[in-house]
């Protein structure tokens, strides 16, 4: 009898366990350990399924109650009936809950999980691997080569120092990450190139620590693993290494990722919140590396001790910098025995093979820097206005001190990266050689080149330059002629930098003595500056001021090789009151973002940067401006009634016009047929299209729109939800470092083919934000500190995937140039000139030149106005760029 009573209880327990297993299996199916699910995600998912879970729980509890009641009944027939009903109720609870969840709130996610095919074709895999290696061949940058120490002789024995040699950085974390499980390691690359490495040293490092500390959504650990000198000495590492070889290769690595900016000091104190959820930051688990005077982008104390010993014991030392962020590298010139240095950021699946080939001389390096490398990162103009700052009086609006509003000031204005350093040197503010170690665009080669302007044609609207490049060295190589313009400047007038990249190309592989003619076309209007302060225009406009424009052929942003001077006789003001819009614009560009300026003091060239100290100082006023309080979008203060319009007319919905989405291919933007199609949408469909769009576009029956599958990311096909991962390409920063538009296009053609193989139509990329600060966590995922270079790479990439029918969602639009507080509606203050000339520039170029048809918004506010509902940013500031095109 007791056994009979146990059976229903066992069944009830089994039902509950099965429901739990179903949930776990669903989680594994959807995420497979690949996606980093946050607490907020779980809470959101539960909230979506609340109704279904409540119904299931009620039925399950009812079943359990019925079983318990049945156990107490003496009538056997009634007992059996209640047992059956209880079991049926519990089974129904499982079936109903799972089905209503799968076909209700989680339908879109499940559809995404089960989408497409599961494999990339062999042909496309091979094409991708070849392209990835070509990118690394041309993206790795030679920084130093004293006495032609490189390339190394074939068969050289190498002592490879630095813990990062056994755990190098292949890419970054987050949406821009990639699957490096099949990657060729750094040591693999050396071995394939014919080098023999010290296996004792390799084993020593591997035994010290096998995994790289995580910088990700779940935690931030800035530990820089490296053994102590005592551990080196106890293992007799240096003595044995000297017996193995007199040549040392030192690898210094730094990682980064989405959700976290990098530590500006390695102290015990968490001086600002880093990460999406404010996770605690571990600065180092190695106490002797904790140093409040040092940042994550400097050598750690243990690394210095290791380098001291290595440079003492080995006469030829080569350094590899494996970091997507510019590091402080002054020490490269402080050790006499460091003869060579190579910059190798995030090389991906096969990029370390390229490193081996460059070290051996099989490949001549032709990469160039996309950022300026300075000696002191704590002295850059943005350093005091990067991090977490909060207004102290938002509780006046919400009534609660728990509701905070973060903000950041883009205090440097247009003087970002090299534009500051080149201009500051010209104005006498800095001694360039004391501040800058490696200029923007810098890169050495194993050969030498001569470049000169051979011919110039100038019709007053366009300048055509012919540049002759000749290989004057002994080995074949590629060269990048760079064109910068230096515009006329009036003290106190429109802000202008002395160096502005406006053209670059990469030559073919030139044999010794071989020459190539490279042609550049420069439109005068592209040298216009945006007059957001309304100095020469009533409403703001692009202005090409009268005067001499120096068109400089350069090897990098600082070294001028040849110059052509173009003269503009009178101001050209591109507004309706003067000379009309620029020819590349669809409508005249005027100010729409005056409110974004706020109450910030911005860096100005006036008086030789007279306000430098004031403008670069950190915030001193943490009071939220009254206008900002009125406009700031917050769930705490949101009032839907503010959007009520008594005169609003309900649009037509649910019309039966007989149109299908497929009928609209090639239909002109202004064709009324679009209105007829949109009239067919129902209210429910409109809500679904607007509110249910993560990694997909929902199927919409009224217009026959199919379900569209979408995925990350900027570096590789990176589908967290489906577990579908493509080739791990070098990160976008290395793609940009090739300075090759052809390779950028080839890169995205390969990713586009992989997207098609997997069945994806939408692609969350490319990442086009700016390297405003070296400590930004996602610099690996973005191209450069320069808007024009970023735009050129983006144009090549977007044009390539558009040809394959892929929708590229260029991101993150706009001013998403750090990770700190990015998801908290951070108020971002900047001048409209800087926004247009630098941060919007890549987006503008992509729309104009590559017919870009997708944008992913950032989560911040421009000024105090949330970008998601900011019509000025979404429409008005872009509408001048190009005639809108529906796709």
What are these regions (language model features)?
Residues 559-579:
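Short beta-strand elements
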């Amino acid at each position: 009898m007791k056994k009979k009573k146990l059976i229903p209880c066992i069944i009830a327990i089994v039902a509950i366990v099965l429901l739990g297993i179903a949930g776990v299996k669903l989680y594994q199916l959807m995420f497979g350990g690949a996606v980093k699910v946050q607490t907020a995600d779980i809470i959101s998912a539960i909230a979506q399924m609340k109704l279904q879970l409540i119904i299931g729980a009620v039925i399950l509890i009812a079943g359990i109650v019925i079983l318990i009641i049945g156990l107490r009944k003496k009538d056997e027939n009634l007992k059996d009936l209640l047992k059956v009903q209880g079991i049926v109720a519990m089974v129904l609870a499982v079936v109903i809950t799972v089905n209503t969840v799968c076909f209700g709130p989680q339908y879109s996610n499940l559809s995404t999980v089960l989408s497409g095919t599961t494999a990339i074709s062999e042909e496309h895999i091979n094409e991708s691997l070849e392209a990835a290696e070509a990118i690394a061949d041309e993206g790795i940058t030679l920084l130093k080569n004293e006495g032609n120490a490189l390339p190394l002789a074939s068969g050289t024995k190498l002592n490879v120092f630095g813990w990062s040699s056994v755990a190098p950085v292949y890419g970054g974390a987050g949406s821009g990450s990639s699957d490096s499980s099949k990657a060729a390691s750094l040591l693999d690359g050396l071995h394939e190139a014919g080098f023999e490495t010290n296996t004792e040293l390799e084993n020593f490092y591997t035994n010290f620590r096998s995994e790289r500390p995580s910088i990700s959504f779940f935690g931030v650990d800035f530990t820089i693993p490296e053994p102590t000198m005592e551990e080196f000495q106890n293992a007799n590492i240096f003595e044995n290494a000297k017996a193995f070889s007199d040549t040392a290769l030192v690898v210094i690595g730094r990682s980064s990722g989405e959700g976290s900016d990098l530590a500006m000091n390695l102290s015990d104190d968490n001086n600002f919140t880093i990460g999406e959820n404010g996770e605690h930051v571990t600065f180092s688990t190695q106490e002797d590396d904790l140093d409040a005077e040092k940042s994550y982008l400097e050598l750690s104390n243990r690394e210095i001790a290791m380098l001291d010993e290595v440079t003492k014991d080995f006469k030829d030392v080569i350094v590899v910098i494996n970091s997507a962020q510019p590091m402080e590298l002054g020490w490269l010139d402080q050790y006499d025995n460091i003869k060579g240095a190579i910059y190798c950021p995030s090389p991906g699946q096969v990029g370390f093979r390229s490193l081996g080939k460059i070290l051996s001389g099989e490949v001549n390096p032709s990469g160039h820097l996309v950022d300026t490398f300075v000696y002191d990162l704590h002295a850059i103009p943005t350093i005091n206005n990067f991090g977490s700052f909060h207004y102290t009086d938002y509780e006046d609006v919400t009534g609660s001190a728990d509701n905070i509003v973060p903000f950041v000031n883009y205090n440097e204005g247009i003087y970002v990266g090299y534009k500051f350093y080149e201009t500051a040197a010209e104005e006498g503010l800095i001694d360039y050689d004391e501040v800058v170690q490696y200029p923007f665009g810098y890169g050495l080669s194993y050969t030498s080149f001569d470049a000169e302007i051979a011919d110039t044609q100038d019709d007053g609207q366009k300048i055509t330059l012919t540049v002759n490049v000749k290989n004057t060295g002994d080995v074949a190589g590629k060269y990048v002629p760079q064109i910068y313009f230096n515009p006329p400047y009036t003290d106190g007038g429109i802000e202008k930098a002395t160096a502005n990249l406006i053209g670059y190309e990469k030559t073919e592989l030139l044999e010794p003595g071989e020459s190539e003619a490279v042609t550049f076309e420069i439109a005068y209007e592209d040298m216009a500056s945006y007059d957001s302060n309304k100095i020469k225009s009533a409403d703001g406009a692009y202005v090409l001021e009268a005067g001499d424009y120096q068109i400089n052929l350069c090897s990098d942003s600082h070294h001028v090789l040849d110059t052509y001077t173009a003269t503009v006789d009178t101001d050209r003001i591109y507004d309706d009151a003067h000379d009309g819009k620029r020819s590349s614009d669809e409508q005249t560009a005027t100010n729409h973002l005056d409110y974004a300026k706020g109450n910030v003091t911005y860096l100005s060239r006036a008086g030789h940067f007279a306000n430098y100290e004031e403008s670069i100082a950190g915030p001193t006023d943490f009071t939220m401006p009254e206008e900002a309080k009125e406009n700031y979008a917050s769930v705490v203060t949101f009032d839907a009634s503010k959007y009520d319009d008594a005169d609003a007319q309900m649009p037509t919905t649910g019309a039966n016009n007989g149109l299908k989405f497929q009928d609209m291919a090639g239909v002109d933007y202004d064709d009324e047929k679009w209105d007829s199609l949109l009239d067919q949408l129902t209210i429910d469909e409109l809500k679904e299209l607007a509110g249910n769009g993560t990694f997909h576009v929902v199927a919409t029956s009224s217009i026959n729109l199919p379900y569209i599958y979408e995925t990350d990311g900027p570096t590789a096909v990176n589908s967290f939800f489906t577990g579908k991962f493509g080739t791990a390409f070098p990160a976008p920063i290395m793609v940009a470092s090739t300075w090759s538009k052809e390779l950028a296009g080839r890169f995205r053609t390969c990713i586009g083919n992989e997207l098609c193989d997997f069945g994806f139509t939408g692609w969350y990329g490319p990442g086009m934000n700016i390297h405003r600060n070296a400590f930004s966590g996602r610099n690996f995922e973005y191209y450069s500190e320069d808007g024009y270079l970023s735009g050129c790479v983006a144009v090549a990439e977007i044009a390539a995937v558009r040809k394959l029918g892929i929708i590229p969602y260029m991101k993150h639009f706009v001013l998403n140039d750090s990770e700190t507080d990015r998801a908290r509606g951070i108020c971002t203050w900047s001048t409209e000139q800087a926004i247009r000339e630098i941060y919007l520039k890549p987006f503008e170029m992509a729309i104009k030149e590559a017919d870009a048809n997708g944008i992913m918004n950032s989560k911040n506010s421009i000024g105090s106005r949330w970008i998601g509902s900011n019509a000025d940013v979404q429409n008005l500031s872009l509408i001048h760029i190009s005639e809108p095109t529906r796709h």
